[in-house]
Amino acid sequence: MPKALTIQRSTVPSAERLNYTKRLKALRSHYSAANCRFWVFEELSLPGAFIEFTEADDEQTLSVAHANAPHKTLDPSRVYQEVDL
C-alpha cells in the first residue's frame, strides 16, 4: 500500500514562535503515538515561514491521526499518495 502525506504551510510572527514550537512538539508526540511521521522545515530566506509534513503508511492511519490531533490541520482532506516509480 502506498504511503500517504499531508502538507501544511504556516507563517508565524516572531512574537508567536515560542507558542508555535510548543504546538509542534505536541503534534509530534501525537503523530508519533498514532504511527505517523511528522517533520517541520523553516524557509532559510524567510524566517517564520514553515512547512509541516505528516506521513503514514496508509491514508486511513493518516486520516484518523489528523481527526484526533490536538491542533487541527487546515485541510486534512488534501492527501498525497506516494507514486511507485
Question: Language-model segments: what does each one mean?
Answer:
Residues 1-85:
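Short S/T/G/P-rich N-terminal loop/turn motif that feeds into the first structured element of a domain
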